[in-house]
Design a protein with these regions (language model features):
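Non-membrane alpha-helical segments in proteins
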Residues: 1-12, 40-47
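Ligand-binding pocket scaffold of soluble enzyme catalytic domains
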Residues: 2, 8, 77-84, 124
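Acidic/negatively charged segments and metal-coordination signatures
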Residues: 11-12, 47, 51, 55-58, ...
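Internal, hydrophobic cores of structured domains that mediate oligomerization or house catalytic pockets
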Residues: 17, 21-66, 72
């Protein structure tokens, strides 16, 4: 677990010396990235890479174009490029120009890298990429369960300013460890342990039935599907607004 803390701490302190090392580590093929970092890969790796990059896109580009790298790593590296745009370190035009090149650089077979490309084009407004996206969908390269054509049309309808504003709603770089790492199960476990200690100190354990004490933690609110409307009224699907990518 200590290496997970280290990843976020390096990102928080913008440690650019970590950038080439992280690129080498996460360029390893197969399931190694997930064996090392678990859900951090899909949850925050793009933001971590952007945070330690110092605005240098070369490492993320190397991951994206490495056909031996894990497909999800390649996808989130594209998110890292978007994070540099929304944080003001790179321009939208430069990022979009590169994404247009990817339609001809990526191997023409379905994978998370194609889903990621569709997502980032939608994030930055897909006008320039609309024809290439149409061909990618027609060729079955993009998983419509991840992002369907309606999502592309909705992003297009927002206009460039609206799409960019929507993209900026999401956190771009790592700036708050508690907020960035709060989704991890270990912190919820620790919180429950601390709560138990306080109860003991206040002599409240006697009032807890054994059934309550051993009951599993359950979700108290309905789970929101990724294709359902965002509960905050953004007009977007949950997966395009508040859901982790």
């Amino acid at each position: 677990m200590i290496h997970i803390y280290a990843l976020y701490a390096l990102a928080l302190f913008r440690e650019t010396r970590a950038y080439p090392l992280l690129v080498r580590i996460f360029s390893r093929p197969g399931e190694f990235p997930f064996e090392l970092a678990g859900d951090v890969v899909t949850q925050d790796l793009g933001r971590i890479l952007a945070s330690v990059s110092g605005g240098d896109v070369s490492g993320m580009i190397a991951l994206i174009e490495n056909e031996q790298s894990n497909e999800w790593v390649r996808s989130v590296a594209m998110d890292g490029l978007v994070a540099l745009v929304t944080s003001g370190q790179r321009t939208r035009d430069d990022a979009v120009a590169y994404f247009l090149q990817l339609f001809h650089k990526l191997e023409r077979k379905p994978g998370a890298q194609w889903d990621g490309l569709a997502h980032v084009c939608a994030d930055l407004w897909p006008q320039e990429a609309i024809e290439e996206l149409g061909r990618a969908y027609a060729d079955g390269l993009v998983d419509t369960g991840s992002i369907d054509w309606q999502d592309i049309e909705q992003a297009l309808a927002l206009g460039q300013q609206g799409a960019m504003q929507h993209a900026r709603y999401r956190d771009s770089l790592i700036s708050d460890l508690a907020k960035s790492m709060g989704w991890m199960q270990c912190f919820h476990d620790e919180a429950r342990e601390n709560e138990g200690e306080r109860d003991s100190e206040e002599n409240l354990l006697e009032s807890l039935s054994s059934e309550y004490a051993t009951a599993p933690i359950r979700r108290t609110t309905p789970k929101i599907g990724r294709n359902e409307p965002c509960p905050w009224g953004s007009g977007q699907k949950f997966k395009k607004c508040c859901a982790p990518r």
